């Protein structure tokens, strides 16, 4: 038998008349669909679902799952994504029946345990971030950004400063920052980085004005560099009447070392699915809690979960609230995982997490500095950016090297981001990887650098060992084939 590396689609396995279920004859009189629904809601043709037996169905998806790659499969140094190992105790707690089988519409008295988790997590995150109040409602990072910006907008309006319609973002910022600003009705204004990869203070003074609503920053920033002038940045923006927003994407570098609230930030979002080991990838679920200083607390989404004596309950009496931003109260399963992680680690453990994340990143950076261009030479925090400009001289681009890494069983780092580094490759090893894993990755990167110089075709034609060879990504982006019918049309 010839074994193919690729798998047929579930539609290609379909055979008319096969099915994967067996139901008894109904003994209840039922009406026809036609007698219930208007004709316009009834299909004219049979839905083209695949027809397969249960065994074929199970084998198909088992085969696909075995071809997936995740943190449990191998090293995943995807910069700015904090692809750390997710402890399995988190899953055990999330599956406790009292939590897993609860419903958001149950009466408060029936879900006191769940509400206590929500309240306790709010309190933990307040302490970690240095904020005065926290809402868990937002479903992800960008959702948290938007929520905080809507709070800023309401605050400025209430203070008679609705003209403040500009949000400052660094040229190294996450793409979600300007996107969230735009979505919230603001104009994004770029501030340049200096030669050290930090916010250029003089340029910041130039762009700040009476229309400044806020500045959005990560610290450490997207280049993995700590903004050592953060207190001066705070003073400049606050004096202009603006607010400071902390993008929590890089919090993994500073836990129990320094808090956003102590740096002068007025609001912060966190990624529970990154820093606090909620599983992520595949589109979710995520969680992007938002913390604020007391001046902004009355604008938080409602309801909040509060403690009244020995009882936990929803509080809808938030006078200036921007309203609900998520049905029910967000993604509760992620709260359970994050709370389990925080309680398991404790303050000392979270500090060690950040120390190990920073150590691992600097170890890789120092090991690769003689083989790749390092645009910013100072110590990094949890991640760093290198450049493939040396390899480009031999006709090999960062994309090619990322493809070659697949042959080593390593997920490629983030590439071509941030945009202000030529042929950039952003590497974030996280704290959970061993020295042996780091050394394996370093050796692979050094080998690829040598191949780019001495045997470039080997890199240009990579990957060689994956199930699917190099894709035509340009055509895939411009002419995507998203329906099975289209596949037939393409073949014809």
UniProtKB/Swiss-Prot annotation:
It catalyses: N(6)-[(R)-lipoyl]-L-lysyl-[glycine-cleavage complex H protein] + glycine + H(+) = N(6)-[(R)-S(8)-aminomethyldihydrolipoyl]-L-lysyl-[glycine-cleavage complex H protein] + CO2. Pfam families: Aminotran_5, GcvP2_C. Its cofactor is pyridoxal 5'-phosphate. It is an enzyme of class 1 (oxidoreductase). Keywords: Oxidoreductase, Pyridoxal phosphate. GO terms for biological process: glycine decarboxylation via glycine cleavage system. InterPro entries: Aminotrans_V_dom (IPR000192), GcvPB (IPR023012), GDC-P_C (IPR049316), GDC_P (IPR020581), PyrdxlP-dep_Trfase (IPR015424), PyrdxlP-dep_Trfase_major (IPR015421), PyrdxlP-dep_Trfase_small (IPR015422). The modification N6-(pyridoxal phosphate)lysine is found at residue 274. GO terms for molecular function: glycine binding; glycine dehydrogenase (decarboxylating) activity; pyridoxal phosphate binding. Its EC number is 1.4.4.2. GO terms for cellular component: cytosol; glycine cleavage complex. PANTHER family: GLYCINE DEHYDROGENASE (DECARBOXYLATING), MITOCHONDRIAL, GLYCINE DEHYDROGENASE, DECARBOXYLATING. The glycine cleavage system is composed of four proteins: P, T, L and H. In this organism, the P 'protein' is a heterodimer of two subunits. Belongs to the GcvP family. C-terminal subunit subfamily. The glycine cleavage system catalyzes the degradation of glycine. The P protein binds the alpha-amino group of glycine through its pyridoxal phosphate cofactor; CO(2) is released and the remaining methylamine moiety is then transferred to the lipoamide cofactor of the H protein. This is Probable glycine dehydrogenase (decarboxylating) subunit 2. The gene is gcvPB.
